[in-house]
């Protein structure tokens, strides 16, 4: 009948791409440019790289074993598979990725307490990275593609993250934390959070249970 169907249920926010972006960013800041964390950051969908660019960059860094501080140095190896044009593009993407990470590091690294670090992190996300705008764009794209539940979840993700930040500031704001410990406490908080989805399309048919 062409009527959108919306499944009424709560979802764990820890599984959302915006959380993947946030946790991988904090892992890199706290523990260095680990392969898995860097690729999770890139593939979160928030850095503006097209899927083919993500895949091509992943293949390049795997082939030439780019890890750790090598991300901060210009790529120079081409082998038999890449041209100078490819290399230039990979370096543009590398600079894009590293700029995000190092800007966030500058915002957070100069502080010692949990509260200060969270405020620095929020400043990066809200002011430097414009995360709320990026989230709105993702939600709009999901809605236009017909992924109504995903769009509704995305639309709420920023507020959920801000609530966790507020809780951390209120409960352990005065405690000194390393970058690694900050990631752990943010992850622990987000792991407990659920999103109760509200349909973004008013014409959706709601399918739920007696418990809701």
Language model features with spans:
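Polyanion-engaging groove/track-forming segments
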Residues: 1-212
